[in-house]
């Protein structure tokens, strides 16, 4: 059962940081957690509507949230921020104003920082979006996984494992298919990983995509 654990949660406190950093009183903790979820889902929908990449990949790597008493700072890591930044500052201002109204920030300021991911296809979330787009276009599962691994290898990753589960290619019985390239030491605690679990809705039902990318080992 050890191989089914979330590799990011396993390494928290050693070589993995939290994506949300804030402090809250016990009574207000659930409210702050719901606020985080609202922020993430709002930004994802906003980026989907912007159509960041012409290839259909949104390019959203991750969202980091830092909260203080009078400030909420959001760092959005994008693989393809070109269209969003071309409209700057209008694009960012619109996002900031709309999100402030949605959250009802009150006296807290909202600060949004866009950071470009230098090698987009070395990020598992962006690769998972790419595979999801291929599967929606009825490309075979194995072909989509191989293409994703080729893109990851071009981005100089040390190792990658891609797994897709569900009714693959419309088969009646659900199964799991995976491909691994390079070194993927999932049981080594000092090994640093990027990981994502991504559901995709197809005409055959929901498929689950999991991607592990080996970054390196902490010394």
Curated annotation (Swiss-Prot):
CDD domains, sorted: KH-II_30S_S3
Gene3D superfamilies on file: 3.30.300.20, Ribosomal protein S3, C-terminal domain
Keywords assigned by UniProt, alphabetized: Plastid, Ribonucleoprotein, Ribosomal protein, RNA-binding, rRNA-binding
GO terms for MF: rRNA binding; structural constituent of ribosome
Tagged with keyword rRNA-binding: yes
Subcellular location: Plastid
SUPFAM superfamilies noted in UniProt: Prokaryotic type KH domain (KH-domain type II), Ribosomal protein S3 C-terminal domain
A Gene Ontology term for the protein's cellular component: plastid
Residue intervals of the KH type-2 domain: 39-118
Gene Ontology BP terms: translation
Family stated for the protein in its record: Belongs to the universal ribosomal protein uS3 family.
Subunit relationships: Part of the 30S ribosomal subunit.
Name the record gives this protein: Small ribosomal subunit protein uS3c
UniProt source species: Cuscuta obtusiflora
Biological classification of the source: Eukaryota, Viridiplantae, Streptophyta, Embryophyta, Tracheophyta
